């Protein structure tokens, strides 16, 4: 019985440390990061509006080019 209890407690400790290590630490949001996210959202709206009057394929090509350039130079991942 004592051996089972010891193994059970060790397993619980191991599982608790693994779940703690797997959690992402919350990042602190500052006013600057909030402003940047608002600018990105506004920038997306401007890009969508700038595709008026051109074909759907041309608009898709332009958006892809902008996203690839952003990825290459800034490494920011946009969903």
UniProtKB/Swiss-Prot annotation:
Residues 22-70, 76-79 form a propeptide. Expressed in roots, mature leaves, stems, flowers and siliques. Most abundant in vascular bundles. InterPro entries: Phytosulfokine. It is found in: Secreted. It comes from the Eukaryota. GO terms for cellular component: extracellular matrix; extracellular region; Golgi apparatus. It holds the Pfam family PSK. The modification Sulfotyrosine is found at residues 71, 73. Sulfation is important for activity and for the binding to a putative membrane receptor. Residues 1-21 form the signal peptide. GO terms for molecular function: growth factor activity. Keywords: Developmental protein, Differentiation, Growth factor, Secreted, Signal, Sulfation. Induction: Up-regulated by wounding. Coiled coil: none annotated. GO terms for biological process: cell differentiation; cell population proliferation; cellular response to hypoxia. Promotes plant cell differentiation, organogenesis and somatic embryogenesis as well as cell proliferation. Belongs to the phytosulfokine family. PANTHER family: PHYTOSULFOKINES 3. This is Phytosulfokines 3.
